[in-house]
A protein has these predicted regions:
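An N-terminal structural lobe/cap that precedes and organizes the functional/catalytic core
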Residues: 30-40
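A structural-propensity feature for long, helix-poor, extended segments
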Residues: 41-90, 159
């Protein structure tokens, strides 16, 4: 953890990860699924106190709170400096992590029960494979600053206007995690990724709403989060798959491409577009990698 704030006392993804990690430590899930390692990826949380310090030290708070051009605001954040102790800790982190890194937002207001903030703030991925450690550090610092800047971008402002909250209340922590996956040629991705929900609003057959529902897809979970074609099933009844009318319907509603981290351009740092480091491939590429058959 970077900063004085305890991640377990925070909000958003940071607190959720700390809770799940503690929960797994007190269970025997590994015994129930031999050969499968169930754990939370190694994570570093940059606390909201660092966010406050960054705004104050670079005199960004007043600029950030005023409605302004997103590009100008982003430039102001990118040219600002992170605290020296944060940079030192990030250097240590990069010495231990050589996989691609997900730089994720974890805001104070994310846990709002009636106003979900999913997709409002940025998550950036960096390939983390440049041979120069200084460039890898600079890319990581830029990704953190871009997450900070997204706190005050127009989409976030407009969404907050629909809630009882004000932008002055928001604070941003950042979660750094190695991307789970395996390198293949010039890309990096997991065998599958997805989202699990504890309540299924559309059960059928033997399914019960409280059984939950899982949506998974080959590669990174981006296609699932964006509502693209993915496989949905109940963890309690994994053999019960969606029943469609005919083979044509199955083909139309099946995944046709997958997303991976692009490893071919290590010199390319994070940009305004959070998906800049990602690349989409046809399924033929996964077949060549040997990753399609186990999940198809």
């Amino acid at each position: 953890h970077i900063g004085a704030e305890n991640p377990g006392h925070g909000r958003g993804k940071a607190r959720g990860l700390a809770f799940v990690d503690a929960l797994l430590a007190g269970t025997e899930l590994d015994d129930e699924f031999p050969g499968i390692d169930i754990h939370v990826p190694r994570s570093v949380v940059i606390g909201t106190d660092v966010f406050d310090e960054f705004l104050e030290a670079n005199r960004l708070r007043m600029l950030a709170l005023r409605p302004s051009n997103d590009e100008w605001l982003t430039w102001a954040f990118l040219t600002a400096k992170l605290p020296a102790y944060v940079i030192t800790d990030l250097q240590v982190f990069l010495e231990r992590v050589r996989d691609p890194i997900a730089v994720r937002s974890s805001s104070l207001l994310e846990d709002s029960q009636y106003h979900p903030f999913a997709g409002i703030y940025s998550t950036h991925m960096i390939p983390n494979n440049h041979p120069d450690a200084r460039i890898r550090l600079a890319q990581l610092c830029d990704a953190i600053k871009l997450v900070y800047a997204s706190t005050f971008h127009t989409p976030a402002r407009r969404y907050l206007e629909l809630t009882p909250h004000r932008i002055e209340e928001e604070k941003m922590a950042v979660v750094l995690q190695p991307v789970v996956g395996t390198p293949h040629d010039n890309c990096y991705y997991p065998n599958f990724g997805g989202v699990a929900r504890s309540y299924n609003y559309y059960p059928f057959g033997r399914m019960k709403p409280e059984d939950g529902v899982v949506s998974v897809a080959l590669g990174l979970g981006k296609i699932v989060v964006e509502g693209g074609p993915a496989l949905r099933f109940s963890p309690a009844h994994p053999q019960v798959l969606p029943q469609l009318a005919d083979g044509k319907s199955f083909l139309e509603q099946s995944q046709r491409e997958f997303f991976a981290v692009d490893l071919s351009r290590p010199e390319r740092g994070p940009g305004v577009n959070p998906d800049q480091a990602l690349v989409a491939f046809d399924l033929e590429v996964a077949e060549r990698h040997g990753t399609l058959a186990p999940v198809a």
